[in-house]
Amino acid sequence: MDSRALPRPAPPAPGVPGCCAARRRPESPELLRCSRRRRPGAVDPGSGAAAVARRNERERNRVKLVNLGFQALRQHVPHGGASKKLSKVETLRSAVEYIRALQRLLAEHDAVRAALAGGLLAPAVRHPLPRAPSGTPATAASPSCASSSPGRGHSSEPGSPRSAYSSDDSGCEGALSPAERELLDFSSWLGGY
């Protein structure tokens, strides 16, 4: 043994007050419970079940709100097959496509408005309507007054984007040049919306 090493003190005998009395365990279980340190992640057995129940209830409420949100979103996006319910992924994809279509519609509307303001396009009210023979409706006399074009579907879904300039169901707006008709017929650009 080295002379520099300190001798270890002998442990005190049980029941004898000594210098290490703070390390002794208390005899009372209440004191023992109070003196324990809680480990991170350790769950008290009594409150664990209640905490889990509260967490589960919060999660159920969260899922319910998410499902209600998807249900509301499904009502606002157009979808082809109304016979089946869209999945959440299909609903989100449809919403993204719908928002992009609305953005294009707004951009094109702004372009038409700017063209009208700049005098590039003549408003439809300035064009004289061709006279229809007696007994025929005015829409049959003018090719631009056709109520709908074959092969150009538009969504009849509520809330679907529609142009006020579209000739699908807006009646006769006057004789437009083919370039003006194409510019004003947004339904062909939106791919079925």
Swiss-Prot record:
The keyword Nucleus applies. Residues 1-58, 128-177 are annotated as: Disordered. GO terms for biological process: chorionic trophoblast cell development; in utero embryonic development; negative regulation of T-helper 1 cell differentiation; negative regulation of T-helper 17 cell differentiation; negative regulation of T-helper 2 cell differentiation; neuron differentiation; placenta development; positive regulation of T cell migration. SMART domains: HLH. It comes from the Eukaryota. Residues 50-102 form the bHLH domain. Expressed in placenta. One of its GO terms (cellular component) is cytoplasm. Keywords: Developmental protein, Differentiation, DNA-binding, Neurogenesis, Nucleus. Efficient DNA binding requires dimerization with another basic helix-loop-helix (bHLH) protein. Forms heterodimers with bHLH transcription factor TCF3. May not heterodimerise with bHLH protein HAND1. This is Achaete-scute homolog 2. It comes from Bos taurus (Bovine).
